[in-house]
């Protein structure tokens, strides 16, 4: 499966630079708004990753737009092309539910996958680059880091690519998650994690098991791309994100124990924040411009107190912005879409394709095409999408079409909706379900509705009427006109080029 290898973020940046996928910016650029404007224009034009070498007021460079194209997401996952991410999805589908060998020959066919799994354990180091420089106690000062202030009405600078490491009281494996963090002071951040996310669940279980005790937390900034992407990929609960990252990267993930707690962090991370959450210590977070294209409302979240900052020599701060699509999360959604397809097909073999349009804010709308097999089949698929992977818990709209429709072509999808749907019969509405708290359109924060659209051809059990047959030209006629077409010269060369 692996087609390219790299060891850490710096190794990956060297690879990008060799391929013209990284632009160094030497001019002084302000982390307050200016970096966002440059990064946004670059991303919308399909441009390179950006390394701001001289942020105004800081000596630490800032990396933006690392995953600003689907191609770079694929490269981060060890692949040369986005289409190869289907293989990553197939491997994940296998790891979620491995099929037992059906015989001796089948065992040999499956051996490569089993070998990949065996090569995934992490490698623990006694010392690591991420601990080359250490600040602790009164020396901890987050203002040394050029944290971006992305939008004019944002409440404060925002750490956007913080890889947060936690462990529940009853778990051996750690959880890795990406949660945005508002800078609150020289040693304090607000940890914005939603209640269903792994870090929040670990914290909740800790509070129940250890009332009044501090909850250990570590945040890695500038981890290698495979580890970052593993944290946002539907890795099976029985598998460590570190282990899966090793598989993507082509060699084992190297980790090191924190100085102040027992959590293990990526050894090659550029910066690591160590600390704790004091139970009951909450603060209002926001507002912030978000991936929806709007400022979100203010809500209370736990405060993360930083006791240690460790970093590499000449550390790089990895950052991003979020805004109306396309932004980095939307681009990543397009690439990771290819990972989701085989996982869904493993559970629902009737699925032909699955698409999360980037303009749907990464995950809020999904289009599914199926080989329909019975009346009501589309509704079963809708329910399956909403319940199978936690990544789709907040998907508000699911459109199900037949396999003659291209899920990635709005012309096809809209045609199916307008010709194969009766709004009353073919619309499924579900009320009072979990919804993204950032979705201000829902009547209650965190609780809203979902809509399923059955845009499939209807079977006799679904309608008493004779169903329409799509118009299609006679194939012999098409072949004759194909042979005659150039001779007709209906379009001039100028028209053809246009």
UniProtKB/Swiss-Prot annotation:
It is an enzyme of class 4 (lyase). Prenylated FMN binds at residues 178-180, 192-194, 197-198. It holds the Pfam family UbiD_C. Its cofactor is prenylated FMN; Mn(2+). The keyword Transcription does not apply. The keyword Plastid does not apply. It comes from the Bacteria. One of its GO terms (biological process) is ubiquinone biosynthetic process. It is a peripheral membrane protein. One of its GO terms (molecular function) is metal ion binding. Gene3D superfamilies: Single helix bin, UbiD C-terminal domain-like. It catalyses: a 4-hydroxy-3-(all-trans-polyprenyl)benzoate + H(+) = a 2-(all-trans-polyprenyl)phenol + CO2. Binds 1 prenylated FMN per subunit. GO terms for cellular component: cytoplasm; cytosol; plasma membrane. Keywords: Cell membrane, Decarboxylase, Flavoprotein, FMN, Lyase, Manganese, Membrane, Metal-binding, Ubiquinone biosynthesis. NCBIfam families: PRK10922.1, UbiD family decarboxylase. Homohexamer. HAMAP family: UbiD (MF_01636). Belongs to the UbiD family. This is 3-octaprenyl-4-hydroxybenzoate carboxy-lyase. The gene is ubiD.
